[in-house]
């Protein structure tokens, strides 16, 4: 849980007795601060003090659950994913989504360049993959300042099946970009047969 102090409405009334908090970096008020679970996988003696040098001894991850029912659903999904019964050409599809940035933050094209570098690396290393690019600036902006066609394209691609979806840009815990092209509500309301790996 990211809210170690319990100040957000999201964690009000949550029992803390069985919560495993994230590791928080020392520079917690700095722009270089971060939260990670990697710390819990540094099992060698004297490891864990240098994250760029130390090696994790096992893979770690979290299930965002609060109930036994949610835990059962997540375990069942993981087992299904690992059994790899849902094979098909969808596993050759990868999508890169890039924010447009703006003049105020001077990131006008940085996100697209970063996403393009990743996409080109995939195309070079794995030529069998079909790389989809959803870059905001390639779509029409609505009069409300949003990108409805970007949202629709992401949804269409997810329904067709993606091995990976990578987002490069600004966002928060509840949405991608200040235009909110993909939100927590979208995720909560979605149900896709093919489960991609999400990278943001």
Language model segments and positions:
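Cysteine-dependent hydrolase recognition
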Residues: 1-200
């Amino acid at each position: 849980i990211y809210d170690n102090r319990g100040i957000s409405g999201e964690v009000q009334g949550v029992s803390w007795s069985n919560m495993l908090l994230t590791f928080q970096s020392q520079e917690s008020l700095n722009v270089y601060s971060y939260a990670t679970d990697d710390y819990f996988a540094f099992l060698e003696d004297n490891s864990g003090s240098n994250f760029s040098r130390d090696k994790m001894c096992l893979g770690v991850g979290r299930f965002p659950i609060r109930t036994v029912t949610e835990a059962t659903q997540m375990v069942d999904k993981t087992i299904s994913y690992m059994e790899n019964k849902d094979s098909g050409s969808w596993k050759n599809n990868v999508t890169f989504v890039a924010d447009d940035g703006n003049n105020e933050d001077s990131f006008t094209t940085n996100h697209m360049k970063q996403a393009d570098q990743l996409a080109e690396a995939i195309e070079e290393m794995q030529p069998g993959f079909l790389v989809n690019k959803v870059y905001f600036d390639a779509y029409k902006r609505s009069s409300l300042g949003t990108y409805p066609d970007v949202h629709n394209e992401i949804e269409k691609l997810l329904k067709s099946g993606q091995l990976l979806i990578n987002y490069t840009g600004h966002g928060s815990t509840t949405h991608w970009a200040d235009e909110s092209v993909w939100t927590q509500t979208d995720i909560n309301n979605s149900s896709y047969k093919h489960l991609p790996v999400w990278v943001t």
